[in-house]
Amino acid sequence: DFLHANDRKGQTPGSGNSLDVDGRHGKVARRAAHILRDAVRLMLTKHQSVQVINARGNHDPDAAVSMEIALEAYFEKEPRVTVQRNDCKIQHFQWGNVCHFVYHGEKNRAHQLAHLTNRYREQIGQSQFVYVDNGHVHHKQREELGPCLFEVWNALTASDQYHADALYGASRSISSVVYHKQFGEVSRNVCDLRIIRQEAD
């Protein structure tokens, strides 16, 4: 849901919920593509390679594909960047003993677990650590189910009118997690929105 809205209608494609949007969709999409591009450039200053996964959400499933295409075109001649295609809503990658899934999280965890263990049985069986990242509800949650550790991450975004009226709200932060190829998660950093604002001033 990086763009929050899929197109200029400003509604969720599935349910038609109204979304608060600021400005024209093209303007927002262009800015979003530039932010993602700059984030990848910054990562390249610190890492040998960057793998980009932009999971499709329920607010912007088509716009997310456009972001993927824009990044793919921009980094076409950069061998250190891989932009993973988001044809499937569940994205995954394997790295040593770590199998990692990225899914927006509209479906409940039991449904996700059933799908993952059925479709990715071989990858999960080869891995000592299985992580599933979700974001849909924005409330920090962490739960082990079967072989998988599910984690729901906070977002930086403010609640829009629909979610505020429904009394939804969560802490606003961004996190980074470091995974060891053999030992799984080894460290994490959390940055609250207030820190980001203070540093920006």
Regions found by a protein language model. Give the residues of each.
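Short, solvent-exposed polar/charged micro-motifs at secondary-structure junctions
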Residues: A63-V65, H92-G96
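Conserved beta-sheet core of the metallophosphoesterase superfamily
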Residues: L44, L71-R80, D87, Q94-D201
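Core catalytic region of metal-dependent phosphoesterases/phosphodiesterases
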Residues: D1-V81
